[in-house]
Amino acid sequence: MIITIDGPSGTGKSTIAKALAKDLNFNYCNTGAMYRTLAYTYLCEPWKHLAIQELIDNPPFSFSFVSGQPLEAFLEGNLLSVELGTPEVANMASKLSQLPEVRFFMQQLQRKYAELGNCVFEGRDMGSKVFPDADVKIFLTASAEVRALRRLKDLPHNSLSKEAVYAQLIKRDETDSQRSLDPLVIPEGAVVLDSSDLTISQVLEKISALISPKLP
């Protein structure tokens, strides 16, 4: 079974997808982390001097594809974690994700991960482009104000103001929804869930109710 969870930044996609995968004992793939891994690498020496095609032709980064474990990212064998969470990396990931060669490269890796079976994929084009025939498609949304507050809590104390985070979210929304290649859209057949006034548990309950009839 393939479950896709798409939506803009700050809607709780990662938290919900990871918890859902754990509840179902499914594999979990955070595709945004895949793009951020490429972005982080591209911002580092010596790879920042390479053309992007050169970088993806011979990537120094890799991803673990192990059944029962979340996908993990490595750069020259070193596990990446907090390095992928900075605004600089997120902004670069958004720019790189607009390149056809980058999207093709990532989508091939994501489909390879799906071969493990029983996966929850979280991203922005999972249900619309990568897995249009997914068994269950969810599109998470929330108000920009709520999303800004959530993102603010994830950042180091006083690193950015609420207004700055809000502006970044609006800009990212515009970039994702207006790009010519695989824009952020509600996938055909997806169930839209507004998480603005819902707890994590409440969102999980709603998604579980959708999935239960489809489980063997």
Swiss-Prot record:
Keyword line: ATP-binding, Cytoplasm, Kinase, Nucleotide-binding, Transferase
Protein name: Cytidylate kinase
Compartmental location: Cytoplasm
Family: Belongs to the cytidylate kinase family. Type 1 subfamily.
Gene Ontology cellular component annotations, sorted alphabetically: cytoplasm
Ranges in coiled-coil conformation: none
Transport among keywords: no
Binding residues for ATP: G7, P8, S9, G10, T11, G12, K13, S14, T15
EC numbers, comma separated: 2.7.4.25
GO BP terms in the entry: pyrimidine nucleotide metabolic process
Top EC group: transferase
Catalyzed reaction equations: CMP + ATP = CDP + ADP; dCMP + ATP = dCDP + ADP
Gene Ontology MF, one: dCMP kinase activity
Organism: Chlamydia abortus (strain DSM 27085 / S26/3) (Chlamydophila abortus)
